[in-house]
């Protein structure tokens, strides 16, 4: 028998390069300095140009990409080219000629270059490394760091550098630790990192990071745990506390990154942190896809203020994100808002997001609002519980369940769901298609009209066995327009047993100046994106 002709036998060719439009890539001066940054659905990859054929409009990359280019929904995969001398045309831009070591910079309006302090880091990726030998039961122990600022590392950009699968896990930290136990970082700063901030890796346990400022990062801020379960089993990372830290301003170079990453690690506490301005995820818990056994369990994510995440960059991210089996993990009393996906893709930008295999997780007493795609989203998972939360203004698909499975996917009970687009639950990723239990919930749409439930009326939705003891009624927030989600004394939610959420307790605590520090951050509004271009013309058959 004969087989149909295939463009490629595997994904490998789609990782090596791509077809571009006429004129988008050309042989610039100092061509070898140019970098191509490719936006995949949930990460970016950075490449040098290995080969260029302008006539055929083909560019080949070094290194190759971890993900096939055009994977998922990105048929019009976004990319940009940077570090090109000819593109230096606006204030605030710079270009580095690697051959001569010359840095060219276009000053900002009113900037006096005679008074500018310019710092070029000479440390390559890691500034401080704690090197215990946990495999030999030899540890670095009982140290306290107070009031120290760890600053300035370079990032590694090379044709043979690894590219990431997810979460900037191939990038090095400014402060790295293995076999670190019973240590405290207090009132410290980690800043101006070319890649990641702090990583407590193999064998790190019972450490505390408290009241630290972590900012201006090329990638992610804090990692707890190893990537692989082999290391996690023999050299566990556990019982670490990340409390009352101001973590803000990452993803500057490696954009698919997050504020806090808890990998193959258990019994950790991530509490009372202010986490903002990362391009993929605020807090990520778990690093195992599907239902395979994993060593991530019993983690607590509580009283965090997570906001301004994704920022129009990606189509698959969230404020608080989970991955894999994680029994005993609790997500409680967090406030999550302003999670903005790229408008070019149909999904992404979730408040609380259970991704592949998320299992055994309790989500309670959280307030989620102003997210682009879903306030509560489950790709697929088992026996999760969302109760006593406020989900407001949840975008296109406020409450979702993407993959039907034979087991109970989740229970949704005692929540308040406030919509403003006439839809309470998604019809695209419909919870009605999954095994889900809905009960004792209060729904309201700001239009005053009855919202739809996965495309059907409330009565039809109830006939499926869901929400038979639930109501549609105004929850009587103090001022939902101003995002004041405190409940008035006469709220029907209180009569239904809803427990008031102490919203004001989320985020930083302590001295007034420390608590007020996040309010001093100034953000530019997100620029409008141009409409996507049409698909490129097909190449002629030869």
Show where each model-derived region lies.
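Short glycine/acidic-rich loop motifs that flank beta-strands on beta-rich extracellular proteins
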Residues: 154-160, 194-200, 218-224, 251-258, ...
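Right-handed parallel beta-helix
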Residues: 128, 141-152, 169-178, 181-192, 204-219, 232-251, 260, 324-325, ...
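Extracellular polysaccharide-degrading/modifying enzymes targeting complex plant/algal/animal polysaccharides
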Residues: 1-189, 230-232, 462-473, 481-532, ...
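Predominantly extracellular beta-rich ligand-binding scaffolds that present long acidic/polar faces
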Residues: 360-482
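Extracellular, surface-exposed repeat architectures
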Residues: 255, 260, 314, 324, ...
């Amino acid at each position: 028998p004969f087989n149909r002709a295939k463009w490629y036998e595997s994904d490998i060719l789609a990782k090596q390069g791509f077809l571009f439009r006429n004129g988008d890539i050309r042989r610039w001066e100092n061509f070898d300095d140019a970098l191509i940054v490719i936006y995949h659905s949930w990460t970016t990859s950075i490449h040098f140009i290995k080969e260029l054929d302008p006539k055929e409009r083909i560019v080949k990359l070094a290194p190759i990409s971890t993900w096939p280019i055009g994977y998922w929904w990105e048929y019009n995969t976004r990319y940009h080219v940077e570090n090109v001398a000819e593109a230096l045309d606006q204030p605030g831009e710079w270009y580095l000629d690697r051959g001569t070591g010359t840095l060219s910079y276009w000053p900002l309006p009113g900037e006096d270059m005679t008074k500018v302090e310019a710092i070029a880091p000479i440390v390559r990726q890691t500034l401080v490394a704690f090197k215990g030998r946990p495999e030999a039961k030899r540890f670095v122990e009982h140290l306290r760091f107070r009031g120290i600022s760890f600053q300035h590392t370079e990032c590694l950009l090379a044709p043979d550098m690894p590219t990431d699968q997810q979460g900037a896990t191939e990038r090095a930290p400014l402060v790295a630790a293995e076999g670190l136990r019973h240590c405290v970082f207090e009132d410290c700063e980690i800043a101006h990192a070319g890649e990641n901030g702090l990583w407590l890796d193999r064998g790190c346990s019972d450490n505390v990071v408290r009241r630290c400022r972590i900012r201006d990062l090329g990638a992610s801020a804090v990692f707890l745990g190893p990537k692989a379960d082999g290391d996690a089993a023999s050299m566990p990372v556990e019982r670490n506390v990340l409390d009352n830290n101001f973590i803000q301003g990452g993803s500057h170079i490696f954009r698919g990154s997050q504020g806090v990453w808890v990998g193959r690690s258990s019994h950790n506490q991530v509490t009372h942190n202010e986490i903002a301005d990362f391009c993929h995820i605020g807090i990520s818990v778990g690093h195992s896809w599907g239902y395979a056994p994993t060593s991530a369990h019993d983690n607590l994510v509580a009283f965090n203020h997570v906001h301004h995440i994704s920022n129009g960059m990606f189509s698959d991210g969230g404020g608080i994100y989970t991955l894999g089996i994680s029994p005993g993990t609790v997500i409680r009393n967090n406030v999550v808002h302003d999670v903005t996906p790229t408008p070019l893709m149909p999904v992404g930008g979730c408040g609380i997001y259970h991704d592949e295999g998320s299992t055994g997780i309790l989500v309670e007493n959280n307030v989620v609002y102003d997210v682009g795609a879903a306030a509560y989203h489950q790709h697929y998972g088992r026996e999760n519980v969302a109760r006593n939360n406020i989900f407001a203004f949840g975008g296109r698909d406020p409450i979702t369940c993407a993959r039907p499975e034979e087991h109970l996917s989740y229970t949704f009970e005692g929540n308040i769901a406030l919509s403003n687009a006439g839809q309470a639950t998604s019809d695209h990723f419909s919870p009605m298609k999954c095994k889900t239990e809905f009960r004792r919930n209060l729904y309201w749409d700001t239009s005053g009209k009855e919202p739809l439930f996965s495309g059907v009326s409330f009565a039809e939705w109830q006939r499926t066995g869901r929400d038979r003891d639930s109501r549609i009624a105004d929850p009587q927030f103090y001022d939902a327009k101003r995002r004041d989600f405190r409940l008035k004394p006469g709220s029907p939610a209180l009569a239904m047993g809803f427990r008031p959420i102490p919203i004001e307790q989320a985020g930083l605590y302590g001295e007034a100046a420390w608590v007020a520090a996040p309010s001093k951050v100034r953000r530019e509004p997100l620029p409008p994106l141009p409409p996507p271009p049409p698909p490129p013309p097909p190449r002629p058959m030869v």
